[in-house]
Structures are given as C-alpha cells and as structure tokens.
C-alpha cells in the first residue's frame, strides 16, 4: 500500500539530518579561524582597492566554509563545506592575485588550484558514497551520520580502498609531495589575505579531516598505511630541503 511504501521510505531516510557539533579539537580550529579571519581583513584593508565588497564577500565565504568543516559531524555536510570553501579562494587568486612571471599568471594559478582540489574532492566523494552504501547494505538505513557510519563493518580490501579515497583528498590539500605542485603558484599569486587563509586555515582542514574522519572510520587500514605515509613525509622533508638549497629567490 501507499502507506507501507511511505513508511519504508521513512525508515530508510530516517537518519538524514544536519548535525553540527564542537569538541576540544573543533574549538581550537574555530578559534584559529576567527583570529586569522580578523588578520586577513586587516592586512587587506589598504591592499584591496577594486571590488572591495565582493572581495570581503569571498573572504567571509571562505571563513564560513572552513568553520563548517570544523563543525560538521555528518559526511554530507563535511563534504559540502569542504567544496564550498574552494570556490571563493579561486576568485581571490584569479581576481585580486599578484601579477606573476611569464607563464605563471594568477588565472593559471587559480585554475590549477581549483582543478587539483576539485579532482581530489571527487575522489573523496566516491569514498563517502561507497561507505554510505556499504552501511545501507548492512542496515537498510541510508545515512551520512558520523556516529552511525563508525559502526559499519568493512572487509579489509574495502576499508583500505575507502581510506585511500579520503587520504588522497587530504594529501592534495596538505599538500603531500608529489601532489603539491598547485601550492607554490597559488601562494605566489594570491593576495596577502588569500595567502593567510590558504596557509593558516585551508591547509589545516586536511589535517583535521584526517584526524576526525579517516583515522576513526578506517582504523585498521590507517594503521596498515601509516608506514607509507611516514615515508612520504620523510621524502617531502628531504625534497624540500634539497630544493631550497638550489633557490636564491626567498
């Protein structure tokens, strides 16, 4: 009957809700975001002379997206805010960025940033949907709720693949060598406020996402992958040190 179908649909989607919460880790990151947001406005007070209103709209848009990332406790909302903060950063770099050397314009830097982050976000979206559908097959409930998804039973191979989806997205945002090539151009071309937000806030969302979601959701796969992540970190340290020795432009 129609009533039975409606009841079944209600049971399937009963876990759909907007869930924001704050704990010790979140409050630290939200406080950092607020402080750096104020500094971003102050340092751009005299620097930005054109389309000032639109500039500050994008700046507040970024801060709102970042705060949303730090407060989201369901994966749909986390992904929504994760993607939301990328669009205004593109505008900050493309419209108010500094003029670069030939072949390294602010448009190119903004486009490179956007492509890298959007592509990695797509990988994370596939991993999120994979986790949600595995949970649905086990429980019959379609949900993005963090507490419910923590209880999902995953096979070793499935857990490892889903963890890699999250890790790739966070590795691009960190960024981890060799997925870092967007960052030097973005920093060089971004306005001062954009660099403050990029280095001080946006990159920290990757570490937060790793601690908040990837490690708790996929503990066994994360432990297995940890040596590889450490090797990547050591390689990045050595690579950065050697590269800095060859550069004369501070």
Model-identified regions with their sequence ranges:
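Membrane-interface helix termini and inter-helical loops of multi-pass transporters
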Residues: 10-19, 137-152, 215-221
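Structural signature of hydrophobic alpha-helical transmembrane segments
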Residues: 24-33, 77-88, 159-169, 223-234
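Short helix-boundary/re-entrant hairpin motifs in multi-pass inner-membrane proteins
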Residues: 109, 113, 161-232
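Single conserved hydrophobic/aromatic residue that forms the stacking wall/gate
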Residues: 2-9, 13, 248-249
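Central hydrophobic cores of alpha-helical transmembrane segments in multi-pass inner-membrane proteins
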Residues: 1, 32-44, 62-63, 86-95, ...
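Alpha-helical multi-pass transmembrane bundles of energy-transducing inner-membrane proteins
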Residues: 57-61, 65-154, 158, 245-247
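Hydrophobic alpha-helical transmembrane segments in multi-pass integral membrane proteins
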Residues: 10-66
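Membrane-interface helix-boundary motifs at transmembrane edges
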Residues: 45-53, 102-108, 185
